[in-house]
Amino acid sequence: MIQFTKMHGLGNDFMVVDGVTQNVFFSPEQIRRLADRNFGIGFDQLLLVEPPYDPDLDFHYRIFNADGTEVEQCGNGARCFARFVRNKGLTNKSKIRVSTSSGKMTLRLERDGTVTVNMGVPILEPSQIPFKAKKPEKTYLLQTPMQTFLCGAASMGNPHCVLDVEDVASASVAEIGAMLTKHERFPRGVNVGFMQVVDSGHIKLRVYERGAAETLACGTGACAAVVVGQVQGKLGQQVRVDLPGGTLTINWEGEGKPLWMTGPAQHVYDGQIQL
């Protein structure tokens, strides 16, 4: 039997598994079965806590989408990860350092119950996103058989393109998201953000996630949207991001500086399951 915890960050929900005290391995097929909301546990991503590979770090953090693919980063998951390792007694630290497949992160448990995550320095160089373009631009043209889209592009350890929309509530997120997530200019696929700028300190956002469709919240998507908005001169240093599942606060001092994300992490229940 495998012990697990169900958690969510603004409705972006996770199955979190302790791979430090348990010996666990998940095949893509098992993950897809567990992610099924009718026949399994149901989740957007599976988060796996592993021992650190580096003695200077506390844990290694792995993320698997509902379709069984392993991905580089998940911001909402990082907040739940921090809350999980503290709740389970795997650490007593309030500042936790972890590695992911895309780099290192610092997670900080705040006194008010929220979690602040140092998401690292955003990547704007196209080849590192990865995105096919000759040089970094504030805005790119993405052509599809149906229409051409204007977008910004950035990586928070995973690739994002961000579209400006007048009204996020009426945006064709499912249709356009499905079209762009596998666009040929993003060799590893892309998460697609739909951003409505309310003012320089406030945006509304919906995100179509690569491998998971639209979710109630996407932490890295919120970060990428603020980066793109700031690069385009539309947003300031601290931005409130309203997602369908709730609100995140993003703070970024500009290019070359790390980005900080603050938001909630909720425990739902503990369970056990036979694979």
Curated annotation (Swiss-Prot):
It comes from the Bacteria. It is an enzyme of class 5 (isomerase). Pfam families: DAP_epimerase. InterPro entries: DAP_epimerase_AS, DAP_epimerase_DapF. The active site is at C74 (proton donor), C218 (proton acceptor). It catalyses: (2S,6S)-2,6-diaminopimelate = meso-2,6-diaminopimelate. Pathway: Amino-acid biosynthesis; L-lysine biosynthesis via DAP pathway; DL-2,6-diaminopimelate from LL-2,6-diaminopimelate: step 1/1. The record marks Y269 as: Important for dimerization. The record marks H160, E209 as: Could be important to modulate the pK values of the two catalytic cysteine residues. Keywords: Amino-acid biosynthesis, Cytoplasm, Isomerase, Lysine biosynthesis. It is found in: Cytoplasm. Its EC number is 5.1.1.7. Substrate binds at N12, Q45, N65, G75, N76, N158, N191, E209, R210, G219, T220. Catalyzes the stereoinversion of LL-2,6-diaminopimelate (L,L-DAP) to meso-diaminopimelate (meso-DAP), a precursor of L-lysine and an essential component of the bacterial peptidoglycan. Homodimer. This is Diaminopimelate epimerase. It comes from Shewanella baltica (strain OS155 / ATCC BAA-1091). The lineage of its organism: Bacteria, Pseudomonadati, Pseudomonadota, Gammaproteobacteria, Alteromonadales.
